[in-house]
Each structure stands twice: as structure tokens, then as C-alpha cells.
């Protein structure tokens, strides 16, 4: 008999599991895969939407595969289909039509949904979030129609900043309001975040440490109240974070953790009553995992993390046996030409969890000083005091940030120290790098003694 696999969710996490199962199964294996997706499109790359809004390409290029691409492979790929409930005992998923879909293995990839701050006016026309293709289309339509003169973004995270750049590039007066004292506070320390603010504030007004109190207007948004001051706005983007979509899991009795995500074990299995369920897996935005530095529960709402988790889920369904391990969640983004990357803990997060640290910041160049078209690069490295192991990194430059963050992610996993960075052989060509790299200089500036053998 065929092994029935039902995947709930058709974002990056669900699609990754589907494709890995389809590619990884042995010819003798008989898998019957059903994917339930509430949206109407096949595979749409949400990560690319902010750049489409900036005019780099159309939203249409983000449609990677239509539903029939998967259906032609024998996959029961259902769009505009909602799961209503899960019966863990009888092993079936009830969908809106009343059909009961039996499963041998269930994959929860239900994603996340925008957090809407409790304030008046969030239902007015012209107020948007950015978490779906439809959201992107509505914003793009308003921008192309020339309907927006003043835009206000609530939230100073990746999506909010990238959207603000898109608005300002179209000549729109743009304000970003962030309740915390600096931008990207879960990823960067304040002095690093200030570099981004200084880079952008020629075109964007930042209201930091402020809270939007109300969105005002009759039918369409007209202004936003921040403290006692009223800011004109004919478009508002609420980008105040994403919350795991766990209603279905919670109603089924699956455990929801401290982070708000579905509790998982190392095999990405969901849990009930403190025990893992061998045939129910969870991954992506809705999954709670364990942080590799703090060892506390956390979320990692990144497509890149979801891909690794999907490999674990697919291998376990196929019987290979696989473990996810601890989560580092390396991130990188392009903010108006400035590449910003982060991995591990910030000094603030380390302080919150009582981790004693040393840190060093270096400003260098991406190439030899004499080489044309040189770019400045700023790196901050954070080490645990007693072991001098690397536990965090933040890098800002116009180039080479992603590859450096990937390198340091592996370094944290392997437990490298400041001395390891200082003593490691590195390649050199003046057109590509400096003899003494910015990471080496940052490790020395941390105060660790690289001359001491360990």
C-alpha cells in the first residue's frame, strides 16, 4: 500500500518537503503526497517581494511553479484549500469541503501571520501588511497608480526597512516608526544599527523609541498618530513582526512552546503530552526549535532554515533517520545596496541570558587599500569570555557579507575561538581581499589574547 503523506502549508517549508520527498524516494517506494495550500498560486517566492516593489523586476517572476507543475508529477497539490481540523487518533485531516484526508505521516508547515498591534484604524483602506502575494499586488498597484504621496511604516525590521526603501525610491515621503530605540534590535547591536539608520535617513524619516497610537481616516487612511503628533499618510504598512500560525495545531492538542511555535524535537517531530509523535512533523515559521547559543526555545522564520528542516523531515519520512540539531538562524539582507548580516547572539541578548562576553569591532576594506572600487566593511564579533568561543557576528558592507556570515555560522557550530580566527590561513589577492582580514582584526580587538595557546 502507498504511504500517505499530507502536508499542510504551501510556503517554502511545505514545498521543500514535497520536492525532497518526491526526489528522494526509492523507485520501489510508493508515496501518495497531498499538499494543502490556502492560496491560489503554486510556489511563490515571498522573499523577493520587497525587491519587486523597489522596481528590480515584476512580481510575476516570483511565480516559480504553477500548481499543475506538481500535479503533473502525480502529486495531489490542492490550492485554495483550508484544513479545518486534525484528528491525531484516527489520523485524518478534515478540509472545508468536508472531505477527510487520511495520512500515515502529517507535516505541519502552516507558516506565520502578521502581528497587528491593538490600535484603532488597522482596518482602513490603504493599510497593508506584507506576507502574501495578494499583499504585494495591492501595494504594487497603489504605487504604480500614483496614489501614494506619504507612506508610514510601523516596524523597523527587515521587511519594514526594505519596503520603506521601495517607497522612498518612488519619491514618496516615508516615515518609519519603531517602538524600540534602534532598528533590527534582535539582529544587531545599537552601534551597528546606527550605521543603517545614518545610511538611510537622507531619504527616510525615523521615529525610534516611539509608538503608533492610532491610524486615522474615514474610509481610507489619512494620518497616523504618534505620541501627540499627527503624521500624514495615504499608505500604512504594518510590519510589526510575524506570529506562528498554530491554531490548527493547538486545537489538535499539539504542544505550543514559550516562543509561540509548535514544540519540536531533534527529528522535527511535534509533541503531545510531553512525548514526540512519530508520524507528525513540524517545520518552518510555525516550529519552535532550540537556539545554538542560549539553548532556549526560539523561532527561526527564514526560508533558508526551513530548507534544512525540510531535509530532516523528508529523510525521517523516508526512513533514513535524521536530526536537525541546534538553530543559529543566520540572516542577511540588502538594504538599498547595503548588505547587512547577522548570526548568533547580540550583546543585548547575551546580557539577557547572563552570558559573559568579549566583543571586537573592526572597520576595514573588502580589498587591498590601493585597489580601485574598494568598499568599506564593518564587522563585530562576539566571544564567550571564558572559552573565547565565537557566539555572535554582525557584518555590514556593500559586498561579501553573505559568504562571511555563512563562514562564521559554520565557525560557531564548530566552536571556533578568537585564536582560531587569528591563526587560520586565508587566501589573498589584492583585488579580492586584504592581507589581514576584517574578521582577524575584529577578533584581536575583542580583547582575547590570540598569542596564548589553548
Please annotate each region the language model reported:
Residues 101-111, 232-241, 310, 388:
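Short hydrophobic core segments
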Residues 2-76, 165-188:
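Beta1-alpha1 glycine-rich phosphate/pyrophosphate-binding loop at the start
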Residues 8-13, 20-29, 38, 240, ...:
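Flexible, glycine-rich terminal cap/loop adjacent to redox cofactors
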Residues 283-345, 433-451:
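A conserved FAD-binding loop/helix module that cradles the flavin
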Residues 110-170, 206, 264-266:
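Glycine-rich dinucleotide-binding loop and its adjacent helix/turn
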Residues 63, 150-151, 158-214, 300-305, ...:
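Rossmann-like dinucleotide-binding cores of NAD(P)H-dependent redox enzymes
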Residues 123-147, 217-223, 230-315:
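FAD-site-proximal beta/loop scaffold in flavoenzymes
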